[in-house]
Structure formats: C-alpha cells, structure tokens
Amino acid sequence: MSLAEFDELRWDHSCDRLDVPSNYLKRKARKTPGGLEELRKSMTSATIYVGNLSFYTSEEQLYELFSKCGSIEKIIMGLDRFKFTPCGFCFIIYQTPQEALAALKYLSKTKLDDREITIDLDPGFEEGRQFGRGKNGGQVSDELRFEFDASRGGFYVPLENRIGAVNHFGARRIRDPHKNHHHHHHGHHHHHGQPHAAAAKVNPMEVEEELDSYIPGQ
C-alpha cells in the first residue's frame, strides 16, 4: 500500500508541519485492510484522540483547555473496561474539522496535570472505543510499562506478575549436579549387558534448575 500522499504531501517547509497524521496512524494504515481510507477520513474528521492523560484529569479540565481551539460538541473519556474508571485517554469531538486541526497544531505536547499530553487525528468515534483494550481492562501501554507512575495507577500490573518466579524472569541457579548422585559400587554384582540404573551418568544438561524467587522490595 502506498501512503505517498501522506508521507510526502508535497509540502516544502523548513520544519515539520503539525497538522498531519502521526506515524502511528500511518503504520496502522499500512497494516489494516481499508486503513488508507480510514487515514483519509481522519484528515477531514472533527474528532481528535488525546493520550497520556493522568487518571485524575477531569472532563472539566479537558473542556477548559480544548475549548480554546473551538466549540466542543462532546468529550468521551476513556474507561477501564472492568472498573469503568478513567484510564488515561479521551476523544474530543469538535463542531468542525478545522477546529480539530487547530487543537492538533496548538495544543500537542501541552502539559496538563504535569503530564505532556499527546494529540492525534481520529477518523471518528465509534461506540466501544472508549474502553481500554489491555488484558487488565486499561491501556496496553500501561501493561507494558515497567516504572512506577503515580498519576497512572502506580505499578499498573503488580510487580510479582511481571518479574520473579511467575514469568521466570529472575536469575537461575543450578543445583549441585553431584548432590544426591553418589554411586556405591561396593557389594553389588552387575550382570554382563545389564548395567545397573544407579551406574548411569548424570547429564549436566538435564540437571534440575532452581528459580531465583527474589522479588525487589519484598
């Protein structure tokens, strides 16, 4: 699939334009059937996607900030699909596409609740997209996050579910390969062609491994 019209756009400028689709949208368009048409729709849509929000940012705060770029018809908060609590993103629907582009140009990377928010074009909101798609109900990006983030739920996935014995992430320790494998040959008579089981050699590659169950902070 060719996205030349979005990669090039025949714009000769000394700096990058701000009213263009993100690399994420272009990658998605290449991988998804009908993605190019969806990308074109996002250029004329009055809807924007806002990400990297604090879980504690309110709809009123969003309205106050984004209404500086135009008349807002609706704000749809992103929710954890199990808890129905905010999970760090939203959709904002303006009255015109020009207002949506203005928000993209002038409000991207604005700091809101001490977080640098991200804004992207959106082809249009559909019911169901307000819910997180992660395994635990929130956003996938939070489930991949390793560091503590107080404004986005702390350690979103419990530490013990990501490291230590659960995911076999800790260091491995090999048991003593000679422990409990001493062979006593005194007093035993071996018949020719029938080696005794106790005389079998220990294969170091088959030695049982002991997982290091140490988890930081515990």
Curated annotation (Swiss-Prot):
Residue span, RRM domain: 46-124
Binding site for mRNA: Y24, Y49, T118, I119, D120, L121, D122, R129, Q130, F131, G132, R133, Q139, V140
InterPro entries: NCBP2, NCBP2_RRM, Nucleotide-bd_a/b_plait_sf, RBD_domain_sf, RRM_dom
Location of this chain's protein in the cell: Nucleus
Signal peptide extent: none
Keyword entries, A-Z: mRNA processing, mRNA splicing, mRNA transport, Nucleus, Ribosome biogenesis, RNA-binding, rRNA processing, Transport
Gene that this sequence comes from: CBC2
Designated name of the protein: Nuclear cap-binding protein subunit 2
Annotated source species: Eremothecium gossypii (strain ATCC 10895 / CBS 109.51 / FGSC 9923 / NRRL Y-1056) (Yeast)
